[in-house]
Amino acid sequence: AFSLDRVKAAYVAIMNFAPLYVAIGRDFMKEQNIEVDMQKVASGTEAMAFLAQGTLDVGGVGITAATFNAFHKGFDLRIVASAALQPRKGGPTVIIVRKALKDSGKVKSIADLKGRKVAIAGGPGTTGAYFVAKALKEAGLTIKDIEMVNLANPDMRLAFEKGAIDAALVGPPYSDQIIGGGKGVLLAQDMAPGAMTTVFMYSGKLMKERPEVAKRFMIALIKGSRAIQGKKYLDSANLKAYLKYVTSTENAIRRGRPQLFDPDLKVYMDSIKNMEEIFREASWTNYTTAIPQERMVDLSYAEQALKVLGPFKP
């Protein structure tokens, strides 16, 4: 009998990796003669460890300081495609400040957060910390100018109510609850418009030992992204695919704002460079010299896939 090529994929159960869910659910992988063995992991850091060891082939990963530390150590893996991108404007992640500070005029802008307590879920080196560090840099400050508090998102509302924090980086539904509760107001939004904060990676083993499979996987993955553009995002076949892998409800997905994906899953190099630079300047990486692009990224699979698929037609 004809057997399918098996590819083991690590994923964190969030909508950022929707093209993969759809590529499987709508049989684009099967069309490419691939069977995907999905392995749920707790974090991108965990996924990268498996990829570096070659025990898993593909991973959906959020970029953090740990990502760059792994590349610096020479981990055998590469970014091959973008996953969800930050919106160009009206992004869900915002910086909220205590209403009393805004009302009194003590905090009018990001620059006024100097010396103040700012809560970020997960603390230093996270994607959230990147947003805050980038906003501070643009205001002429560094992350060292604030007191960072590592606080889980659900705990932030109470911290605002008690006056235990001055500001926080937070997203829905918590941001809406804090503002709705009257103790916090919006200070900044769209700190990194269009940023590529989540990516798909291949293991060195897959690239070296099965380059053909890696290329076919990419064809299916890009088809998955193209199938969820614009209004198609909520097609019933897509919803069914999302719900197989994400802990959510159809209602919540319909109500929530759609994640943004490049139809070609293009890798945004300037985005990677900017994140790496900000993480380095904040001393969240354990090295000081920029990592060469070819040690982090391999664009050849997407390029080959696009030759087969042709340009995206909305």
Predicted regions and their residues:
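Sec-exported extracytoplasmic/periplasmic mature domains
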Residues: 25, 52, 56, 72, ...
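Pocket-lining segment of extracytoplasmic ligand-binding domains
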Residues: 154-244
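Short, glycine-/small- and polar/acidic-enriched structural segments
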Residues: 2-150, 166-172, 185-194
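Conserved C-terminal helix/tail region of periplasmic/extracytoplasmic solute-binding proteins
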Residues: 277-314
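Secondary-structure end/capping motifs
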Residues: 208-289
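Extracytoplasmic/secreted envelope proteins and their assembly/folding machinery
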Residues: 17, 21, 48, 64-67, ...
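Short amphipathic alpha-helical segments at helix boundaries and their inter-helical linkers
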Residues: 55-58, 161-165, 258-274, 303-311
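Short secondary-structure boundary/hinge segments and terminal tails
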Residues: 41, 47, 69, 88, ...
